[in-house]
Amino acid sequence: MSTLRELRLRRALKEQSMKYRLSIKKTLPRWKGALIGLFLICVRTISGSGSESNLPEPPKVSVDSSLMIEPNLTTEMLNVFSQ
């Protein structure tokens, strides 16, 4: 009788372990994909910051002197109020 009980117990444990393995197989690819994505983000960030990439220089803008206002409005107002 103990052998039948042991066989049933072994069978039940085997079924439980199979269910556990199947559930791991379903959730493991999700975790694996998330970890691979996180790893790739880290690698890209590290390689991007260490590459010392040369950014294009901003264009040097020159302003035509005829567009500049002489005298300045504040100095003109100070002259008006000081008189």
From Swiss-Prot:
The keyword Repressor does not apply. It is found in: Host cell outer membrane. It is a lipid-anchor. Keywords: Cytolysis, Host cell lysis by virus, Host cell outer membrane, Host membrane, Lipoprotein, Membrane, Signal, Viral release from host cell. GO terms for cellular component: host cell plasma membrane; membrane. It comes from the Viruses. InterPro entries: O-spanin_T7likevirus (IPR020130). GO terms for biological process: killing of cells of another organism; viral release from host cell. Residues 1-50 form the signal peptide. Its main location: host cell. Belongs to the T7likevirus o-spanin family. Homodimer. Interacts (via C-terminus) with the spanin inner membrane subunit (via C-terminus). Part of the spanin complex which spans the entire periplasmic space. The spanin complex is composed of spanin inner membrane subunit and spanin outer membrane subunit. Component of the spanin complex that disrupts the host outer membrane and participates in cell lysis during virus exit. The spanin complex conducts the final step in host lysis by disrupting the outer membrane after holin and endolysin action have permeabilized the inner membrane and degraded the host peptidoglycans. Host outer membrane disruption is possibly due to local fusion between the inner and outer membrane performed by the spanin complex. This is Spanin, outer lipoprotein subunit. It comes from Enterobacteria phage T3 (Bacteriophage T3). The lineage of its organism: Viruses, Duplodnaviria, Heunggongvirae, Uroviricota, Caudoviricetes. The gene is 18.7.
